[in-house]
Amino acid sequence: PSQFKFAKDRIENLETVPDIELIDYRLLEGKFDAVVSIEMFEAVGSEYWNSYFQKIQNVLKPNAKAVIQTITMTKDYFEGYDKWPDFIQTYIFPGGELASDQLFIDEANKFDLENIKTTNFAKSYAKTLETWYENFQIAWSDIEEMGFDAKFKRTWDMYLAYCRGGFLNGQLEVSQYLLKVK
């Protein structure tokens, strides 16, 4: 909800105001000029990848495009990851699942969504995670006053460090895929 409000506030004074909705993607109807999905693909989990891409295909107008930003992992790392849940799947995003870059593209292709451009930015995302970690440490006393305990802090310290390490060592990537209907 706070991201929704932020987006609504940002577009408030535009001449042409885009439609921004807070809705379960599976309930979305109509046809759109574009679809933008930011770090949601990995949250739906592999069980729902088909319905995710099917929905994108169904709501795009002819010649429309979709931009999907998602976190992926190397193919080698994925081969073990899909068998043994990691820290993030266990404690942060139960049910979520990352794909490899090629698996993401293959899954999109099943629904006639062709990847026409990929932009990767793992190193800058590692810096973002470092900044989030620093801000979390600075804000901890305020967060603790809201009732969060030391276990919560350790979990988030681990999560932010774990992710940063994955981006720095090349196991994780954050990418934006520009897709069009074939």
Per-region residue spans from a language model:
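Conserved SAM-binding loop
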Residues: 7-8
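Hydrophobic/aromatic anchor residues within beta-strands of the central parallel beta-sheet
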Residues: 16-20, 66
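A short glycine-rich, Lys/Arg-flanked "PGG" loop and its adjoining helix->strand segment in the class I
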Residues: 50-65
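Alpha/beta-hydrolase-fold catalytic nucleophile elbow
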Residues: 69
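Conserved Rossmann-like nucleotide-cofactor binding loop
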Residues: 2
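Substrate-binding/catalytic lobe of Class I Rossmann-like enzymes that use SAM or dcSAM, i.e.
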Residues: 72-182
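A short acidic, Gly/Pro-enriched loop at the edge of an enzyme's catalytic core
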Residues: 23-36
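A short SAM/SAH-binding and catalytic strip from SAM-dependent methyltransferases
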Residues: 34-48
